[in-house]
């Protein structure tokens, strides 16, 4: 979508582009310098993710990331951009106690520069999604593999593989949309299920290991640049392999998402 004007994109901009069949390119971002590079390369949404616990802080999970740390990084990203849409994760423990507490914490993220908050959880979070969305806070719901639930889920594994699990995820998606979610992120689910859910919903879907039929795609920045420690997950493509600069790698990612060339078959489940 056109980012030539200095006006910051809105959820309406993204929804309109989605309705016209344009794919949405999303990357995580945690600082002003990378934010400026990613915006210039044409990324539509910068997700200030609690994944910073892994790739910035060197921790083994996202669970220790605090709200104050998220606010700091949202401010950094906001200062480095002018047009791109900014989404922020609500970290573990900041939205589960009550909708009222979630609202107070979400307000702090929005005041720091976020335009949307992302909440992990299925239909049990519908009340919180509704509470926030009715009070002016756009919400992206997150289902499938949820890193904040890693201990409950028994590790990082594909979700929705059985008929019952797939049905549960479809129900979650519909109930979260009904509750007012403006976007849905689906992580590590079979591609056919990602396509089914995308067709069921009227809101944009963002996939990470959820197939090419989603309205858009997201990757962790460090993964797509090939600089994360350890083996890259199956759903990741290292875009630095064929690029001579970070700017080119990110531009190639955006183009691949927009053209539907990423994810390819080998990146799906």
Swiss-Prot record:
GO molecular function: 3-methyl-2-oxobutanoate hydroxymethyltransferase activity; magnesium ion binding
Matching SUPFAM superfamilies: Phosphoenolpyruvate/pyruvate domain (SSF51621)
Cofactor(s), names only, from the UniProt record: Mg(2+)
One Pfam family it belongs to: Pantoate_transf
Pathway given in the UniProt record: Cofactor biosynthesis; (R)-pantothenate biosynthesis; (R)-pantoate from 3-methyl-2-oxobutanoate: step 1/2
Protein name from the UniProt record: 3-methyl-2-oxobutanoate hydroxymethyltransferase
Chief localisation class: cytoplasm
Enzyme class (EC, first level): transferase
Record-listed Mg(2+) binding positions: 50, 89, 120
Assembly mode: Homodecamer; pentamer of dimers.
EC numbers, comma separated: 2.1.2.11
GO cellular component entries: cytoplasm
Cofactor: binding comment: Binds 1 Mg(2+) ion per subunit.
Active site: 187
Binding site for 3-methyl-2-oxobutanoate: 50-51, 89, 118
Family, as annotated: Belongs to the PanB family.
Domain of life (superkingdom): Bacteria
InterPro entries according to UniProt: Pantoate_hydroxy_MeTrfase, Pyrv/PenolPyrv_kinase-like_dom, Pyrv_kinase-like_dom_sf
Subcellular location: Cytoplasm
GO terms classed as biological process: pantothenate biosynthetic process
Listed HAMAP family: PanB
Keyword Cytoplasm listed: yes
Keywords (A to Z) from UniProt: Cytoplasm, Magnesium, Metal-binding, Pantothenate biosynthesis, Transferase
């Amino acid at each position: 979508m056109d980012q030539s004007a200095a006006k910051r994109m809105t959820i309406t901009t993204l929804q309109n582009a989605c309705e016209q069949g344009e794919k949405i390119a999303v990357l995580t971002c945690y600082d002003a310098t990378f934010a400026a590079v990613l915006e210039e390369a044409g990324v539509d949404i910068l997700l200030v993710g609690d994944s910073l616990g892994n790739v910035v802080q060197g921790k083994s999970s996202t669970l220790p990331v605090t709200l104050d740390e998220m606010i700091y990084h949202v401010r950094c990203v906001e200062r480095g951009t002018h047009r791109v849409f900014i989404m922020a994760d609500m970290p573990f423990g900041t939205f589960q106690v009550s909708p009222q507490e979630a609202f107070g914490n979400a307000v702090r993220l929005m005041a720091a520069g976020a335009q949307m908050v992302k909440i992990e959880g299925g239909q049990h979070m519908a009340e919180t999604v509704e509470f926030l969305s009715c009070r002016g806070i756009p919400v992206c719901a997150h289902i499938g593999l949820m890193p904040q639930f890693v201990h409950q889920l028994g590790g990082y594994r594909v979700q929705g593989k059985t008929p019952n699990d797939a049905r549960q995820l479809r129900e979650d998606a519909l109930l979260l949309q009904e509750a007012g979610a403006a976007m849905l992120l689906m992580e590590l689910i079979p591609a056919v299920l990602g396509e089914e859910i995308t067709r069921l919903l009227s809101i944009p879907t963002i996939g990470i290991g959820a197939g090419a039929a989603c309205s858009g795609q997201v990757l962790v920045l460090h993964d797509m640049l090939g600089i994360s420690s350890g083996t890259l997950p199956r759903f990741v493509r290292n875009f630095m392999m064929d690029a001579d600069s970070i700017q080119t790698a990110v531009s190639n990612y955006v183009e691949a998402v927009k053209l539907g060339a990423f994810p390819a078959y080998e990146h799906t489940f």
